[in-house]
Amino acid sequence: YNARTFLLSFPAGETSKTQKIKTFLEEQMLKNNCGRDTLIIALGGGVVGDMAGFVAATYMRGIPYVQVPTTLLAMVDSSLGGKTGIDTAQWKNMIGAFWQPKKIFIDLDFIKNLPLEQILNGYFEIVKMSITSNKKLFYFAEKNLRAVQAKNVAVLKHLIIEGLKIKARIVEKDEKENDDRMILNFGHTIGHTLEKLSNYQLMHGYAVG
């Protein structure tokens, strides 16, 4: 298959999740003659996934994209569910769209290179999910904290799979967050406030946890 590819990147972190960056990405796509047959590959953490998904949702009124999350938090949370968007000066994730990825590819090799703070960032999100929906998973996560810190692949794989099962089950019933899906926002009201007050220096998982 003779596909033409090119790479677009932007500075890491929540402060890049802006209209300015979105416009930059869209303008680069236009310069490269991207059409409705274009496929966006979101290779990165949650911010990359959110941005790529929102661009995909709005570019030429919608083009496909796939998620390739490279952080534990993105693997277990933001890559699944179709929530995309950007932040505003007032609040987080206030402009966006529900736009489902065509595929999600999770490669545990990415975890090997993550710093401990990023591992814990995702771990806290898994704990949050388990508190709301799976007591057994909560005890497993609690019992295996040291294994998580040591990047034990078998333990992390189990946590990711079980966390995704929780989220997938809820999203399948309530894709647009009108009812059951709101439970996934547990801890987010306070968490988003803490992130905002820290000028997004505090990671999402830590704020929620």
Task: Enumerate the language-model features and the residues they cover.
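Glycine-rich beta-strand-to-loop/alpha-helix junction loops that act as flexible
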Residues: A12-G13, L43-G45, F186-G187
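ATP/NTP phosphate-donor binding region
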Residues: Y1-L39
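Redox-cofactor binding/interface segments in oxidoreductases and associated redox assembly factors
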Residues: I41-A42, I106
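Short glycine/serine/threonine-rich phosphate/pyrophosphate-binding segments
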Residues: V47-F54, M75-V76, H192-T193
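Active-site segments that bind and position negatively charged phosphate/pyrophosphate groups
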Residues: Y139, K143-G209
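A glycine/threonine-rich phosphate-anchoring loop and its flanking beta-alpha core
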Residues: F54-A147
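Phosphate-handling active-site elements
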Residues: K31-D37, M60-Q67, K196-Y206
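Structural motif
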Residues: L8, A42-L43, V68
